Amino acid sequence: MTDPIADYLTRLRNAINAKHRVVEVPASNLKKEITKILFEKGYILNYKFVEDGPQGTIKVALKYDSVNKVNAIKKLERISSPGMRQYTGYKDMPRVINGLGIAIISTSKGVMTNKEAAELKIGGEVLCYVY
């Protein structure tokens, strides 16, 4: 697989479109960090790391509105890819839907949102947009 992050986002997107409650994805440290950010920002209900085999899996419980069954995630968009990396400095940090969404950035200090990276004044690779 050439782009495991794109595969992870696609699995989440497909589960959302199929109205699944839980999706299971192969684990990696970067996927764990992205999942943690999605949980902290309220885009997913819960997550659990399951140690099975050499890699393990991440079980992600998707978050839906209880009244009209609308998902908390409207769009997951991969920005940087292995063939064309997209980097940004802290002064040029992207604003997703005028601050309503988040950009997930991989920095030298770890994976964080665009707002956290701007506060720390560090740039990095723009992994994806979530809104």
Curated annotation (Swiss-Prot):
Single GO MF annotation: rRNA binding
Domain of life: Bacteria
PROSITE patterns attached to this UniProt entry: RIBOSOMAL_S8
Role this protein plays: One of the primary rRNA binding proteins, it binds directly to 16S rRNA central domain where it helps coordinate assembly of the platform of the 30S subunit.
Family label: Belongs to the universal ribosomal protein uS8 family.
GO CC list: ribonucleoprotein complex; ribosome
GO biological processes: translation
Annotated protein name in UniProt: Small ribosomal subunit protein uS8
Subunit relationships: Part of the 30S ribosomal subunit. Contacts proteins S5 and S12.
Gene that encodes the chain: rpsH
Pfam short name (any one): Ribosomal_S8
UniProt keyword list: Ribonucleoprotein, Ribosomal protein, RNA-binding, rRNA-binding
